């Protein structure tokens, strides 16, 4: 898979930046109003009862702020957060080590929770329900099970694939929040806030232009701002203007709707070779040289969101909106 400026997945260079930009409270957090308002109520109620917050599952496309919300939950509850990920927990013993290190009330954040192995999920069930850990000591006929009490804690799981979670695990979360793509106005506010942190002057129209091309995703908006800032410093006077922004994004091959060369390759491949479809996923994969799961999980969601692509039982179909975007005529049936 090509490295993508417009990928919602976190890249190495994003991590330090995201930490410095991360809001600390729900009041500072821009967007996701429905999830935010519900969490405000649940957190306040838990604090009034002097209880831990119910376990929380945050799901939705990458780059929308799941990690940020997990940290905010811990801050609002006044507790520490311990962070790990599904792929990092390889054995039940790894999970046991994490759980036994928690202090009362702590938040345990597991990113990519859908990638937990089923055997590890089974260790997690009693921990989530009864705050206890069942471990097996010894092997064979002499093996015995020992139950350890755990301090009350809140598990916050994050996933881009809620459907990949097993039903028993999903059912143990008391709070389920789907994170939605951001509006242009919300992203524009995020871009202006990030520019303040960078100590970079930015025109409001330039912030809007970056927001329009950021695919509804704050991580992409901040990444685009970083690249446009480079052009402003080298090709301009340091101020991010509309002119500099349009020039930079054109050179970066990010079009007015936030589509890049990979999106163009996928859509034009279906249009030019298969008359717009329907065409099967495996055929599209072979045509553009990308793995089918990458197309399905990474490239297609935004194209579906903006109505440029349809998934049908017969295959993928490019819509009239995409033809219009490319200035092409729709083929007659």
From Swiss-Prot:
Entry GO terms, CC: cytoplasm; Holliday junction resolvase complex
SUPFAM superfamilies xref list: P-loop containing nucleoside triphosphate hydrolases, Winged helix' DNA-binding domain
PANTHER family attached to this UniProt entry: HOLLIDAY JUNCTION BRANCH MIGRATION COMPLEX SUBUNIT RUVB, PTHR42848
Region (Head domain (RuvB-H)): 256-333
MF-aspect GO terms: ATP binding; ATP hydrolysis activity; four-way junction DNA binding; four-way junction helicase activity
InterPro entries named among the record's database cross-references: AAA+_ATPase, AAA_lid_4, DNA_helicase_Holl-junc_RuvB, P-loop_NTPase, RuvB-like_N, RuvB_C, WH-like_DNA-bd_sf, WH_DNA-bd_sf
Domain notes: Has 3 domains, the large (RuvB-L) and small ATPase (RuvB-S) domains and the C-terminal head (RuvB-H) domain. The head domain binds DNA, while the ATPase domains jointly bind ATP, ADP or are empty depending on the state of the subunit in the translocation cycle. During a single DNA translocation step the structure of each domain remains the same, but their relative positions change.
Catalytic activity reported: ATP + H2O = ADP + phosphate + H(+)
Pfam families on file: AAA_lid_4, RuvB_C, RuvB_N
Binding-site positions, Mg(2+): 67
Region spans: Small ATPAse domain (RuvB-S): 183-253
Region (Large ATPase domain (RuvB-L)): 1-182
Function: The RuvA-RuvB-RuvC complex processes Holliday junction (HJ) DNA during genetic recombination and DNA repair, while the RuvA-RuvB complex plays an important role in the rescue of blocked DNA replication forks via replication fork reversal (RFR). RuvA specifically binds to HJ cruciform DNA, conferring on it an open structure. The RuvB hexamer acts as an ATP-dependent pump, pulling dsDNA into and through the RuvAB complex. RuvB forms 2 homohexamers on either side of HJ DNA bound by 1 or 2 RuvA tetramers; 4 subunits per hexamer contact DNA at a time.
Class of the enzyme per the UniProt entry, highest EC level: hydrolase
CDD domains named among the record's database cross-references: AAA
Residues annotated as binding ATP: 21-22, 63, 66-68, 129-131, 172, 182, 219
Family: Belongs to the RuvB family.
This protein's record includes keyword Cytoplasm: yes
Subunit structure: Homohexamer. Forms an RuvA(8)-RuvB(12)-Holliday junction (HJ) complex. HJ DNA is sandwiched between 2 RuvA tetramers; dsDNA enters through RuvA and exits via RuvB. An RuvB hexamer assembles on each DNA strand where it exits the tetramer. Each RuvB hexamer is contacted by two RuvA subunits (via domain III) on 2 adjacent RuvB subunits; this complex drives branch migration. In the full resolvosome a probable DNA-RuvA(4)-RuvB(12)-RuvC(2) complex forms which resolves the HJ.
Protein residues bound to DNA: 311, 316
Keyword flag ATP-binding: yes
Species name: Bacillus cereus (strain G9842)
BP terms from Gene Ontology: DNA recombination; DNA repair
E.C. code: 3.6.4.-
Locations listed in the record: Cytoplasm
Keyword entries, A-Z: ATP-binding, Cytoplasm, DNA damage, DNA recombination, DNA repair, DNA-binding, Hydrolase, Nucleotide-binding
The protein, known as: Holliday junction branch migration complex subunit RuvB
């Amino acid at each position: 898979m090509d490295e993508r400026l417009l990928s919602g997945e976190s890249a190495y260079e994003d991590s330090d930046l995201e930490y410095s930009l991360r809001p600390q409270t729900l009041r500072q957090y821009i967007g996701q109003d429905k999830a935010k308002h519900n969490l405000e109520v649940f957190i306040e109620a838990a604090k009034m009862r002097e209880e831990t917050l119910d376990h929380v599952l945050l799901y939705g496309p990458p780059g929308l702020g799941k990690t940020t919300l997990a940290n905010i939950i811990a801050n609002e509850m006044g507790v520490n957060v311990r962070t790990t990920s599904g792929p990092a927990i390889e054995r039940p013993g790894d999970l046991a080590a994490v759980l036994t290190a928690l202090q009362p009330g702590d938040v345990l954040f597991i990113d990519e929770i859908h990638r937990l192995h089923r055997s590890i999920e089974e260790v997690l069930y009693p921990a989530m329900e009864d705050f206890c850990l069942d471990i097996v000591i010894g092997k064979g006929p002499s093996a015995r099970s020992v139950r350890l009490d755990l301090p009350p804690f809140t598990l916050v799981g994050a996933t881009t694939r809620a459907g990949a979670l097993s039903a028993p695990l999903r059912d143990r979360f008391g709070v389920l929040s789907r994170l939605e793509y951001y509006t242009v106005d919300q992203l524009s506010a995020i871009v202006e806030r990030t520019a303040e942190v960078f100590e970079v002057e930015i025109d409001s129209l330039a912030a809007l232009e970056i927001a329009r091309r950021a695919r509804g995703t704050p991580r992409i908006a901040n990444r685009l701002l970083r690249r446009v800032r480079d052009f402003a410093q080298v090709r301009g006077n340091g101020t991010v203007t509309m002119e500099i922004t349009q020039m930079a994004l054109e050179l970066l091959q990010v079009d007015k709707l936030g589509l890049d060369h990979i999106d163009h390759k996928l859509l034009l491949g279906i249009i030019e070779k298969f008359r717009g479809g329907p065409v099967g996923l495996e055929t599209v994969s072979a045509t553009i040289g990308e793995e089918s799961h990458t197309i399905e999980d990474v490239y297609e969601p935004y194209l579906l969101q903006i109505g440029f692509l349809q998934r049908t039982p017969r295959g993928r179909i490019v819509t009239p909106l995409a033809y219009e975007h490319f200035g092409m005529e729709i083929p007659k049936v």
